[in-house]
Swiss-Prot record:
One of its GO terms (biological process) is response to hydroperoxide. The lineage of its organism: Bacteria, Pseudomonadati, Pseudomonadota, Gammaproteobacteria, Alteromonadales. Transmembrane segments: none annotated. InterPro entries: YaaA (IPR005583). This is UPF0246 protein Sden_2729. Belongs to the UPF0246 family. Coiled coil: none annotated.
Amino acid sequence: MLVLVSPAKTLDFENPPLTTEHTRPTLLDQSQALIKECQKLTPVQIASLMKVSDKIAGLNAARFAQWQPNFTLGEAKQAIFAFRGDVYTGFDADSLSAAQLQSAQNHLRILSGLYGLLKPLDLILPYRLEMGTRLENAKGSNLYAFWGEIITDEVNRALIEQGDDIIVNLASNEYFKAVKEKSLKGRLVTPVFKDCKNGQYKVISFYAKKARGLMARFIIEQQPKDLTALISFDLDGYYYSEAQSTPSSPVFLRDEQV
């Protein structure tokens, strides 16, 4: 299975990575083209475009100005250890064994506004450029126009390399929109996680994000070969609901936390 996840706004470049093993992003030429567009922006324009504070806008203006493609381990960090946030809390990369980390390298991909598609051990520099950003560029008025079919082609290439035809979409809608679903050369499965609150099961963002990370970890650890094995997912109290599920959208429920 090939697993797709979103990146995170929260980054950790303070703590050293747990391994020196690393790879380089495949789409750095495209990243550099985007950076050139970002370098044209003033901090005031960045604040407006990204809807962030003046402080964060200033930080990212400096990051854009300093970005260069020949980065090395030390100034850069592997994506799976650099991203922090609810999905990555659930995934808990810091506790992966060497074998599990290699499995993640083969079966996990991180969608990115700046880097397109990342392998877990791909080095990245600190950045903020969400996929939904309406950044004017040579190809159009946003990042979806910029990336076009490029990310989808990389997903299809990774799908072939990892050996089967199942794509598990654990990314947010904002990020998965960068993938052209009709051009995918595999079966797409999008799990849904619902928590019970006040007697009703519904998607609660904080819990759902962590659950996506938990399922990504489950896939890396258990290496399920088919959907029957995938729906055996039962971490953190979630269980499969046959009644609410379809083959392309398995639903997992969790009862109200006491």
